[in-house]
């Protein structure tokens, strides 16, 4: 995984190293028996930094291994969001549509929806828990920093549309008080909220995809999710 920014030659060398590792990994993986009655899946990782030709080359190489699914790495490392989306779209144009596409280390709620629209199926990210520990929660109306003074006397629910029990149990003012007092309960409440919000967002995205209304819903949601309240 290359940092951002990195020069073309470094990105190219790193990509080829990834491809060499991949062959050895596949050989080892396929020669290893599963344990305890469970089998694992192997997702090779597309690299290439923010260089379109390298991403295309890597995606073609990765797809040629015909594994159970495919991953996209080396994004969300500091590059502008428009570059992330451009690279995602480039790679998804090559990776087979009938196998899961996993975008690693992404991202904000807006990032998730925009990348789903480009063909991504799976994500992982520390953002909902890490940001929660620092007082930031994601809601259906936008992002809130609970440490800000504006929430000191706000006794409304964390998220009036939230689906977690903490949303209807605790107020913004109370959770802000917990953070200001360095009470661990504040971090726990914010973490529970953010994890449930991310789960709800993905559940709703799946529903909208199945109903054929994803694009309209996504465009509406992105405008709200991008707000800092």
Which residues does each predicted region cover?
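C-terminal extensions of enzymes
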Residues: 1-7, 159-229
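Active-site beta->alpha loop and helix N-cap motifs at the rims of alpha/beta catalytic domains
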Residues: 1-23, 28-32, 39-42, 46-53
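Surface-exposed helix-capping loop/turn segments at secondary-structure junctions
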Residues: 28-38, 99, 205-217
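Glycine-rich phosphate/ribose-binding loops and adjacent secondary-structure elements
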Residues: 32, 37-158
């Amino acid at each position: 995984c290359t940092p951002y920014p990195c020069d073309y030659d470094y990105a190219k060398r790193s990509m080829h190293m990834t491809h060499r590792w991949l062959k050895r990994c596949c050989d080892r993986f396929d020669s290893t028996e599963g344990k305890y009655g469970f089998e694992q899946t192997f997702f090779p990782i597309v690299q290439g930094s923010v260089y379109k030709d390298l991403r295309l080359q890597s995606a073609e190489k990765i797809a040629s291994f015909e594994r159970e699914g495919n991953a996209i790495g080396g994004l969300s490392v500091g590059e502008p969001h428009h570059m992330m989306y451009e690279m995602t779209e480039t790679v998804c144009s090559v990776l087979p549509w009938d196998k899961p596409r996993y975008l690693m280390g992404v991202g904000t709620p807006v990032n998730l929806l925009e990348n789903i629209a480009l063909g991504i199926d799976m994500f992982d990210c520390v953002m909902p828990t890490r940001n929660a520990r620092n007082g930031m929660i994601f809601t259906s109306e936008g992002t809130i920093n609970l440490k800000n003074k504006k929430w000191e006397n706000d006794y409304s629910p964390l998220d009036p549309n939230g689906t977690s029990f903490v949303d209807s149990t605790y107020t913004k003012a109370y959770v802000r008080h917990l953070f200001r007092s360095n009470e661990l309960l504040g971090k726990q409440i914010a973490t529970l909220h953010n994890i449930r919000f991310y789960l709800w967002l993905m559940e709703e995205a799946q529903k909208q995809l199945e109903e054929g209304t994803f694009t309209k819903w996504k465009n509406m949601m992105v405008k709200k999710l991008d707000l800092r309240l």
